[in-house]
């Protein structure tokens, strides 16, 4: 029997901002809209997004990242010890257009407030539906927060400090009733791919070493914390199709990841191109794998039959009840999809999930 609490109809928290919110952000930057006006626009956008997600039947609802100016702002805005913006560097070059705004860790890192407490509170004010909150993983932020040429020890220390901060935030979110937290780290997706590992080497990076170092930080979020029974904490490695998976996965980095990753839920890419599908054979039994089946970059809808065949292929390698279905990453404004196109993509995920699990969801 399917487990309702495995959240088979999945997504990645990030959604395409509505036109009204995009216009409000632009007006705020021009000084034509005050902070209160921007918050009102964010509140309206989140309320609309929650309603849409509920109608789509998604297992948990998010705020779409509509309150965040950039992917790492949840950390940068609430943690002291970050300095100026960093430009360039090997990791940023590997990520390419996917690289977020980065700031250098220059001093002791300490939380000055809750990272996502305001987001959780605002969601709880508009719905009693299960909530999804996404945070950047400590390993990801650490790799992006050290200037070029700094020793790996600096990255490890930064990762450990961030793991403690983010771990406390995850525990606080779980305690106040958030059902599902995703730690977002697309750098894994680049490093695990054969083409990405090759490009990393060209940039002077050792892919397996980076994977090990990030896992040490990300795994530390779990240290000494007991979560509620039906709380989910997952690791999201998806890149939204940005990583080149045409040559499959790199054996060394993949083995390092599969052997050490401690999470009970991971989000991976599982495209139509067979060699680009995340290898499921090495996944630890009992881990729920959320398959990224629907592309967030293209407006064209995938074939239902073709997606079903991919799920069937995955189910031949692992228990189908340990599979969830999703897109291949979060939706963003940069992807260029309209709100209607986004809804159709998510509706496709929901439709296929109900084909497999039906009324059990």
Regions found by a protein language model. Name each.
Residues 1-361:
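Domain-level signal for soluble alpha/beta catalytic cores
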